[in-house]
């Protein structure tokens, strides 16, 4: 699985056990990702921060 990084055109191959890509952004600015990474369990969104997780290559 490869997940996008914050830098455009770069991606990261996920280590074993981390089979989700996620994108984190502030609810106030949904078009501007704050973090993009590999993760094992999708974090819960809050009032300020939203997480979008997926399990296909570069879907974040």
UniProtKB/Swiss-Prot annotation:
GO terms (BP aspect):
killing of cells of another organism
| Tissues where this protein is expressed | Expressed by the venom gland.
Q: Which GO terms describe its molecular function?
A: toxin activity
Major localization listed first in the record, in broad terms:
secreted
Any idea which UniProt keywords this protein has?
A: Cardiotoxin, Cytolysis, Disulfide bond, Membrane, Secreted, Target cell membrane, Target membrane, Toxin
The answer on whether this UniProt entry bears the keyword Phosphoprotein reads no
Pfam families reported for this sequence: Toxin_cobra-type
- What's the superkingdom here? Eukaryota
Name where it's found. Secreted; Target cell membrane
From the record, give the cysteines joined by S-S bonds: 3-21, 14-38, 42-53, 54-59
Tell me if Secreted is a UniProt keyword of this record: yes
**GO cellular-component terms in the record?**
extracellular region; membrane; other organism cell membrane
UniProt subunit comment: Monomer in solution; Homodimer and oligomer in the presence of negatively charged lipids forming a pore with a size ranging between 20 and 30 Angstroms.
Known role: Shows cytolytic activity on many different cells by forming pore in lipid membranes. In vivo, increases heart rate or kills the animal by cardiac arrest. In addition, it binds to heparin with high affinity, interacts with Kv channel-interacting protein 1 (KCNIP1) in a calcium-independent manner, and binds to integrin alpha-V/beta-3 (ITGAV/ITGB3) with moderate affinity.
Q: Which family does it belong to?
A: Belongs to the three-finger toxin family. Short-chain subfamily. Type IA cytotoxin sub-subfamily.
Q: What's the name of the protein?
A: Cytotoxin SP15c
